[in-house]
Amino acid sequence: MYAVFQSGGKQHRVSEGQTLRLEKLDVETGATVEFDKVLLVANGEEIAVGAPLVEGGKVTAEVVQHGRGDKVKIVKFRRRKHSRKQAGHRQWFTEVKITGINA
């Protein structure tokens, strides 16, 4: 059984027991989170596709940890001008473990 849900402007395909990183959610570690923007639920041969959402569809997950991703370096370089600008960015994330999928 798997589902596709929307969170943080992105779509994620998940199954029970899977862990994944989402955009930072404002919840505590160990808390349970419910995602109700479910776009598709598949259970073997049965596939429920929403238009745009599956009615009664829900994905529940447990928050494992919060953290920051790897550093992304941004470089702006002006040729022949002896000018260079460097910056870095580390995006916050929330790691969740999928505990249930309901259709």
Curated annotation (Swiss-Prot):
RNA-binding as UniProt keyword = yes
An example of a Gene Ontology BP annotation on this entry?
A: translation
Q: Which InterPro entries match?
A: bL21-like, bL21-like_sf, Ribosomal_bL21, Ribosomal_bL21_CS
Residues crossing the lipid bilayer are none
One Gene Ontology cellular component: cytoplasm
Which terms are listed as keywords in the entry?
Ribonucleoprotein, Ribosomal protein, RNA-binding, rRNA-binding
Which Gene Ontology terms cover its molecular function?
Answer: rRNA binding; structural constituent of ribosome
Q: What does this protein do?
A: This protein binds to 23S rRNA in the presence of protein L20.
PANTHER family assigned to the protein according to its UniProt record, in alphabetical order:
50S RIBOSOMAL PROTEIN L21 (PTHR21349), LARGE RIBOSOMAL SUBUNIT PROTEIN BL21M (PTHR21349:SF0)
- Family stated for the protein in its record: Belongs to the bacterial ribosomal protein bL21 family.
Subunit relationships: Part of the 50S ribosomal subunit. Contacts protein L20.
- Name of protein: Large ribosomal subunit protein bL21
Q: Which organism is it from?
A: Vibrio atlanticus (strain LGP32) (Vibrio splendidus (strain Mel32))
